[in-house]
């Protein structure tokens, strides 16, 4: 049974709105204790009426439905909203939730505590610009789980609704396919003697999942990894897929910034349209905060095993550099439980082994983005800094792309003449050798991808809205008939809306050809 079907049942069978909300809150409590992204992070989740310190809030309806306690003894305030899709998000609800989440309370030791994160869970498919504007510049980090994140979660929703919790409601883990097993085996042999290598794999053939298996294999599911991506959207996607697909334990640390809340953007800003609000896990670019998180992750790793993984955007690579430099340069005494006596009965203290902070592997996704020019005497861009092992220390580097970027010899010569250096993916010193390749045509032949299709269609006047026709007629606008036709044609093709004329005209010549391909 799907998430949507569970929602439909709750809507039909709940006695009233309050009962519907209570059912959803209980479902979300079980979800947070079961979904891999949160299950290893949270050691307790309470309904508000179960929260042991609610008396400090006066006991009224504060807009806080759940409270979670993390393994690092931090508290999250959680709001669960079971909205109808047509219902607008109430901005007063958000304001009320944030205001009460800023209040402090005393724990059972008499220590003052505060919430470190606000998690907003709702059933809408979009959040809205007004809501996003409201939660910017808050003192407490704000995260949102919406309909799509919940609907796509690898969870048995029927079992969860029936009261089960934990690993029993997690869907069966997938296993590598034949081409992925080949890539994993080749990587294992390759990294025995080499430090850097490349996967050239067509989109849709499972680069991200293959990389996870390589990382698990090479670290025995017990390493320190850096995964770099060019956007927050890809970071979120990778974070969720790795947490879902791992057969071990992953302790994530997310490094990225939400530049959408800043008017000033640097050349290394995380420049994509995704806000960190929709990143389903806490993220930071504060060096001290990240160092604390990483050290806590290593404590967890020492107890139960697992991989400590930094998920970061390339644009935040300077932050990762500062974090690693600090961890490698600082020697720390380990706690009193590790004080020993020497042979002559002189006490000595065990010193932390900082070498564990050298990455076992750096995985560079969309590696063609790490190519480009390095001009002598100027700062390198964030994307090319990853190649420098003095900048980021790692035992191995894996570069992955579907579209390798290689510069011509002529371009390289011109760069040298201009006191510059080109980072090209045929540079073995920087990128290593090609470990495995599967191109688009081979993937189609193996049945892994759908082939391209040509969609031929025409645009009738009745399909062009009057507003666009007026814009075309207005010589002061930049839109042309040709541009408008292409835009409408693309929309129709992507939504698979075809007129009878378009279907018939597949057999003859047309004014417009729009090339698209099936989703893979």
PLM region spans:
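Conserved interdomain linker/interface between the two RecA-like ATPase lobes of SF2 helicase motors
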Residues: 427-516
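Active-site beta-strand-loop-beta-strand hairpin of nuclease catalytic cores
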Residues: 59, 67-78
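SF2 helicase catalytic motif II
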Residues: 315-316, 330-399
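Conserved two-lobed SF2 helicase motor
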Residues: 303-323
């Amino acid at each position: 049974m799907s998430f949507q079907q569970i929602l439909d049942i709750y809507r039909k069978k709940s006695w009233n709105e309050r009962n519907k909300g209570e059912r959803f809150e209980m479902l979300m409590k079980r979800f947070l204790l079961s979904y891999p992204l949160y299950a290893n992070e949270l050691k307790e989740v309470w309904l508000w009426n179960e929260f042991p310190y609610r008396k400090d809030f006066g006991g009224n309806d504060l807009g806080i439905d759940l409270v979670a306690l993390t393994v690092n003894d931090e508290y999250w305030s959680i709001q669960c909203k079971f909205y109808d899709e047509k219902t607008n998000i109430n901005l007063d609800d958000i304001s009320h939730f944030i205001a009460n989440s800023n209040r402090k309370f005393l724990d059972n030791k008499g220590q003052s505590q505060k919430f470190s994160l606000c998690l907003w869970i709702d059933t809408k498919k979009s959040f809205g610009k007004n809501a996003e504007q409201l939660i910017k510049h808050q003192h407490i980090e704000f995260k949102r789980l919406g309909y799509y994140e919940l609907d796509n979660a690898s969870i048995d929703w029927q079992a969860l609704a029936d009261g089960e919790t934990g690993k029993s409601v997690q869907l069966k883990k997938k296993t590598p396919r034949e081409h992925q097993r080949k890539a994993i085996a080749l990587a294992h042999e390759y990294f025995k003697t080499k430090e850097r290598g490349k996967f050239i794999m067509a989109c849709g053939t499972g680069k991200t999942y293959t990389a996870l298996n390589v990382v698990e294999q090479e670290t025995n599911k017990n390493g320190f990894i850096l995964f770099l991506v060019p956007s927050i959207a890809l970071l979120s996607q990778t974070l969720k897929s790795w947490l879902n697909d791992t057969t071990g334990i992953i302790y994530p640390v997310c490094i990225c910034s939400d530049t959408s809340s800043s008017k000033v953007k640097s050349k290394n800003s995380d420049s994509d349209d995704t806000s960190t609000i929709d990143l389903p896990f806490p993220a930071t670019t504060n060096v001290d905060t990240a160092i604390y998180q990483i050290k806590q992750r290593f404590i967890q790793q020492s107890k139960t095993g697992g991989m400590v993984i930094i998920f970061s955007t390339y644009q935040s690579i300077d932050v990762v550099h500062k974090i690693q430099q600090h961890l490698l340069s600082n020697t720390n005494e380990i706690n009193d439980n590790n004080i020993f006596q020497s042979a002559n009965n002189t006490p000595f203290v065990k010193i932390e082994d900082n070498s564990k902070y050298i990455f076992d592997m750096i995985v560079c996704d969309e590696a063609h983005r790490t190519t480009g020019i390095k001009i002598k005497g100027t700062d390198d861009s964030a994307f090319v800094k990853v190649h420098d092992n003095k900048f980021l220390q790692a035992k191995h580097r894996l570069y992955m792309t579907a579209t390798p970027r290689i510069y011509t010899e002529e371009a390289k010569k011109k760069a040298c003449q201009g006191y510059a250096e080109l980072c090209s993916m045929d540079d073995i010193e920087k990128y290593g050798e090609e470990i495995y390749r599967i191109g688009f045509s081979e993937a189609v032949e193996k049945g892994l991808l759908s082939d391209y299709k040509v969609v031929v269609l025409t645009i009738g006047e009745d399909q062009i809205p009057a507003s666009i026709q007026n814009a075309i007629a207005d010589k002061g606008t930049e839109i042309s008939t040709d541009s408008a036709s292409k835009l409408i044609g693309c929309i129709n093709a992507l939504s698979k809306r075809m007129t009878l004329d378009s279907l018939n005209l597949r057999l003859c010549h047309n004014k417009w050809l729009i090339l698209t391909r099936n989703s893979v």
